Amino acid sequence: MRDHGPMLSAYASSLSPEDPLSALTIGERPEPEPPDGWSKVRVRAASLNHHDLWSLRGVGLRAEQLPMILGCDAAGIDEQGREVIVHAIIGDPDWRGDETLDPRRSLLSERHQGTFAEHVVVPRRNLIQKPPQLSFEQAACLPTAWLTAYRMLFVRGHVTPGETVLVQGSSGGVATALIMLAHAAGARVWVTGRDPKKRERALALGAEQTFEPGARLPERVDAVMETVGAATWAHSVR
């Protein structure tokens, strides 16, 4: 991997609501230099999120911000040689409290260049020591999807062992994390999904039962984790 000069990146060079992949370019971009209080990370692994497709469609990204390197999540090696996970939310340095309420917060690749590159720069406070038992690839999948799932289950949902959790949607990063985290916490996990193979995979991840979308459930659940949207809202609140 090069130490200086242009770096290989995947970036939005245009915006296309109808054909987002046509707006994606793989090529060289200038290697970033960290401002004061920030650190450069040599990216060893980065993970995809649906956010990246939305960016290519122009959701949360304007033409005057282009080219924008995509990617919210990564794991790599910082300037001190530490193995780190990159936290994706860039907040106001003066904000105190729940960062999801910070009106000036953004995700990497919205205002600041993202992680789909050989290097990324972020505030030092955004770097978390990577657990040694996790590979770089595993660690890179954690920040956006798994933090979202954790917050849904335990911060907002207050799920406790023995409760029944319904996860609407059997695929996707957040749904996968919801199933595995809820199962690990001792909850009984039910999952809905259209695709039989994805429902089967949900069982392998820890779900106790799976159902067709909208199916009548054997009993009421304690918490519903909604990852689909309007198509399942009526079923979620029934």
Where does each model-flagged region fall?
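Glycine-rich beta-strand-centered segment in the early N-terminal region that forms part
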Residues: 30-47, 59-96, 108-114, 131-133
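NAD(P)H dinucleotide-binding glycine-rich loop of Rossmann-like/cofactor-binding domains
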Residues: 87-169
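Flexible cofactor-recognition loop at the NAD(P)H-binding site
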Residues: 48, 172, 230
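Conserved acidic residues
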Residues: 82, 118, 163, 208, ...
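Short N-terminal binding/cap micro-motifs at the start of the first secondary-structure element
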Residues: 16-26, 36, 50-52
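Glycine-rich cofactor phosphate-binding loops and adjacent beta1-alpha1 units
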Residues: 190, 204-238
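Mid-domain Rossmann-like dinucleotide-binding core that forms the NAD(H)/NADP(H) cofactor-binding site
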Residues: 139-215
